[in-house]
Structures are given as structure tokens and as C-alpha cells.
């Protein structure tokens, strides 16, 4: 499994990239590998407010369906619309095929996430 350095990770195998007060969220390699070929992604709506732990997006594969939960609370400021037409981009490069960006309302919630080294050791 590939673990991208410099990112944070959730217990549900999602990755989080922090850039100022905005986080980018995507599906980690472990999750996409276990799901198999991804055929559909239900994206959140821009301007939606989310709470940490809320369902953010749904990913469906030939094997199963899985939710991506919000790693932090805040407002959706951007979604990766490419995934509407090309959900398999997550399988090609899950760290480039991000799902959405959230403007954080409570950055302290980042402390609940795992750094890359600890995440890799847990796999």
C-alpha cells in the first residue's frame, strides 16, 4: 500500500491535506485497493455545512459501497467534478483524485487524525 507522506489519515482510510484553513479530502490507497474498481462517486454540494464524522460522500465499486466521512467540521468550498464522469480516477491515483475541499470551522479536530508514519505502521 502506498502512503503519501505529509498527509493526515482517518481511521476509515481517508487522507487529508491541510493548506491553511482548508483541507482536501480523498480516499487512501488502502481503501481504494480494498474497494476495487470504483464505478460511482456521490459528491457533496458546494456550500454544504458538515460536522466531523458526518457522511461526506459515497463511493461505489464493483465489490461494495463505502462512505467517506468528514474528517473536520466546516463548509464545502470545492468538489472534484472530474469524479462525476471519471470515478475510476481514484483507482489510478487516489492521492491526485481528491473528493472535496472543506474550509474548517474547528481546526482543533485535526488532532484526531493520524500522521503518515503512524498510519503506515497501522496497516
Q: Where is each model-derived feature located?
A:
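Short glycine-rich, polar/acidic loop-and-turn segments at beta strand-coil junctions
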Residues: 29-31, 61-63, 72
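Surface-exposed strand-loop junctions at beta-sheet edges and helix termini
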Residues: 44-45, 50, 62, 71, ...
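Acidic, low-complexity mobile loops and tails
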Residues: 1-58, 92-123
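Short, charge-rich, low-complexity interaction segments located
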Residues: 76-92
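Residue-level recognition of beta-strand microenvironments
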Residues: 16-18, 62, 79
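Short, Lys/Arg- and Gly-enriched loop/turn segments at beta-strand edges
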Residues: 58-69, 86-88
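Structural motif
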Residues: 22, 73-75
